Amino acid sequence: MKKQLKKEEEKEKESEEKQARYFIYVIIFVAILIMAILSLRYIFPQKQKVQSYSYNNFVFTNISGLWYTEIQKQGTNKVYSVPLHFSPSELGNISIEGDVNQFKNKTNIYITFDPEGSEFSYIALSASEISINLAQTFNITPIAACTANKTAACISRPVVDCKTPGQPAIYLKYENATRVYVQNNCIFVQGNSWELVKASDRLMLKWFSIMP
């Protein structure tokens, strides 16, 4: 009986470790994929009808399912084409609670998640989108972290649970309620499946000063 319980515990632990590793791998894959798409867009421009509209003096153009707008990099004259999964017209019902702009001047920001949670694919997609924009537009270094050191994938990662002062972080949470809010030294970005990605894009558009 004890052996059976031990085997079940080992299987459960192995499953959790695989999920956490999957999260890290998906972040890397999606980041590379997005950068490749951006590069191909300029190397092989396509002549096609595109959906486009203006919002708050920013033009949003839908190309192959992604929304692009041009953003000037903070403190420079460089302009980047930023890809998002959702445009402002789809994000008006998500409010920002608290002062998220206080995080824009940080040198590093941790991107943390619960390794024992679920739906890592949406968390990874959100993490990669936020990470690319932090580095490319705000010159902020994103650091992958975990809220607990409970899986093999998190052994070499910093533990950031939003309870320790001096660790600015974005905590990606898979929850039913779609929210973006500040608590302690963290920005909590939460939602269910694609709603989590929406919440991530909403934060970015706030930081770009496109949406209030």
Regions found by a protein language model. Give the residues of each.
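N-terminal Lys/Arg-rich, disordered targeting/topogenic segments
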Residues: 1-20
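Hydrophobic membrane-insertion alpha-helices, especially the h-region
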Residues: 24-42
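Residue-level signal for well-ordered alpha-helical segments
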Residues: 16, 20, 30-32, 57
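Short, flexible coil/linker segments at or flanking structured domains
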Residues: 11, 31, 41-43, 48, ...
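Glycan-processing catalytic domains of CAZymes
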Residues: 13-18, 54-55, 62
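Long, folded non-catalytic interaction modules
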Residues: 62-212
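Ser/Thr/Pro/Gly-rich low-complexity linker/stalk segments immediately outside membranes or between
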Residues: 43-59
